[in-house]
Amino acid sequence: MNEQFIQFPQIDPIIFSIGPIALRWYGLMYLIGFGFAYWLGMRRAKNSNGVWTTEQVDQLIYTCFWGVILGGRIGDVFFYNFDRLLQDPMFLFRIWEGGMSFHGGLIGVIVAMIWVSFRQKRSFWNTADFIAPLIPFGLGMGRIGNFINDELWGRITDVPWAVLFPSGGYLPRHPSQLYEFFLEGVVLFFILNWFIKKPRPAGSVAGLFLIGYGVFRFLVEYVRDIDPNVNTVDDLITRGQLLSLPMIIGGLAIMIWAYSRKKA
């Protein structure tokens, strides 16, 4: 029966190792994402007529990098592994044993943007609107890393493109990582970079990012496998959906505020 479904490609998550040091596909995907964001940010700075300098973009992306890493790790522990943290507080610092939370990473990036905006004496919304279109590609690459790691797969299904994941019991499952790669990494990237082709009111680009990611993540959660220990709230809504709702509501509020202020 399983022959009709797609076999998971056996990819070693470690590209190569030298002694105790190993380069993993998951880490490489994040590096590619940040590298692309850096390149695109520099390109936009050079075309910004002096609104942004390459030095300012360098500072912004470097600071956001650490915001993603620290916020993503802390968010993963507090949102999804809090019970383990209570039993073993040092788990927070063993990064190699855990994952990354997007919502935690987002909080880390917001803190980083506030700090950079203060240092550069510019509006927070100006900073947020600049960084938002740079994010989706990195999100997509992170989902490719999840796929290679054989993790965060979807629920059992009989769709023709179902994948037999080894860690998923070789049962046919939705390749939800690839759905997220396409929606959050590709579609959202093109939406945002199309949106910024014309002048937009301050905050509207950031608001659109929050809406887009929140909606796409909320939808994919319906086919993403559920962790019965942490991922559902009263069996009605997953933890990921619960965390995405404030993004959607907040994004809509920011968009309404941005355009109403423009009219005023």
Curated annotation (Swiss-Prot):
It is an enzyme of class 2 (transferase). A 1,2-diacyl-sn-glycero-3-phospho-(1'-sn-glycerol) binds at residue 143. One of its GO terms (biological process) is lipoprotein biosynthetic process. Keywords: Cell inner membrane, Cell membrane, Membrane, Transferase, Transmembrane, Transmembrane helix. GO terms for cellular component: plasma membrane. It is found in: Cell inner membrane. The chain crosses the membrane at residues 14-34, 60-80, 98-118, 128-148, 176-196, 203-223, 240-260. GO terms for molecular function: phosphatidylglycerol-prolipoprotein diacylglyceryl transferase activity. Pathway: Protein modification; lipoprotein biosynthesis (diacylglyceryl transfer). Its EC number is 2.5.1.145. Catalyzes the transfer of the diacylglyceryl group from phosphatidylglycerol to the sulfhydryl group of the N-terminal cysteine of a prolipoprotein, the first step in the formation of mature lipoproteins. Belongs to the Lgt family. This is Phosphatidylglycerol--prolipoprotein diacylglyceryl transferase. It comes from Actinobacillus pleuropneumoniae serotype 3 (strain JL03). The gene is lgt.
